[in-house]
Amino acid sequence: MIKEGFLIKTPKKLIALLGPSGSGKSALSIELAQELDAEIFSLDSLSIYEDINIASAKPSLKERKNIKHYALDYLNIDEKNNASLFKTLLEDAMRVSSKEILLIVGGSSFYLKSILEGLSGMPKLSDEEVVKIEREIATLSNPYIFLKSIDPNMAFKIHPNDTYRIHKALEIFYATHTPPSEYFKANPKKPFEHAISLFALSVEKNALANNIKQRTKSMLDCGLIEEIKALYIKYPKDSQPFKAIGVKESVLYLEKRLTLKELEEAIISNTMKLAKRQNTFNKTQFNNLYMGSVGEIRHAILKHSKSDTRER
């Protein structure tokens, strides 16, 4: 029930456009936004940071002037992003957008899955408590083995290489002194209340490899090293973005641990591995997801949006 004088404006249609790095999501999203008179919510764990423009392949200022983008330039480099933050920003965008359609565009599919399935609220911690917990976790020789010892049920659900989820589980343990599985029982997930139509780009392997090579070369030509150098001087070395592809290799170059040629090769290789993981995730982790080429997805989204609008 809406209280008198309090109206939440939400887009009538939420459409997610997913796809691996280098698949052409950004270019297609701009085209679609223009044709559908839509706005764009950026679901990207790097574009959310200020001052990371080249490494994140962030939309240009001209593109952003013509089409409203949300969740760009929101965090400083030394702040952390997570699924809960993206959910909050998405709900904020839904409230303020006056358009019929909001396109959710990005490669951070794990965050979208977490939002759709629902998030359990994390314990509220002060900055001092966060630092203390981070130190505790850093002293563990094998975080996964420790998690297994305190909460076998939770450890069973997490792959030993899934450092993100292991870390989150241990944060809960140190913050609450409760096994994470018990904490989640007491704080159940709340599924997302709004329907999101899911589409994902699937690009042929050789074409994707060529896109990634061209993109990497372009990033280096546009000043990637200079961009990361400015951040490396200014911010703590353990800041979350310094672990991202394109950034971490540039740091190794700045530390003279890679040559320029090795830097380019490392970014290409790591991006291709990431793209493979993203593709697999999109294929296996979503129900009712439509996958196809750029042309197929463009046609499917336009048809889906326009028929839906006519029905209303």
From Swiss-Prot:
Its EC number is 2.5.1.75
Q: Which reaction does it catalyse?
A: adenosine(37) in tRNA + dimethylallyl diphosphate = N(6)-dimethylallyladenosine(37) in tRNA + diphosphate
- Site feature location: Interaction with substrate tRNA: S108
User: Which InterPro entries does UniProt cross-reference here?
Assistant: Dimethylallyltransferase, IPT, P-loop_NTPase
Note the superkingdom of the native organism.
Bacteria
Q: Where is this region: Interaction with substrate tRNA?
A: 44-47
GO process terms (BP): tRNA modification
Query: Is Plastid there in the keyword field?
Result: no
Q: Where does ATP bind?
A: G19, P20, S21, G22, S23, G24, K25, S26
Q: Does the keyword Transferase apply?
A: yes
Q: What are this entry's molecular-function GO terms?
A: ATP binding; tRNA dimethylallyltransferase activity
Q: How does it assemble?
A: Monomer.
The UniProt function text for this chain reads: Catalyzes the transfer of a dimethylallyl group onto the adenine at position 37 in tRNAs that read codons beginning with uridine, leading to the formation of N6-(dimethylallyl)adenosine (i(6)A).
PANTHER family listed in its UniProt record: TRNA DIMETHYLALLYLTRANSFERASE
By what name is this protein known?
A: tRNA dimethylallyltransferase
What species is given as this protein's source? Helicobacter pylori (strain J99 / ATCC 700824) (Campylobacter pylori J99)
Taxon lineage: Bacteria, Pseudomonadati, Campylobacterota, Epsilonproteobacteria, Campylobacterales
Q: Which gene encodes it?
A: miaA
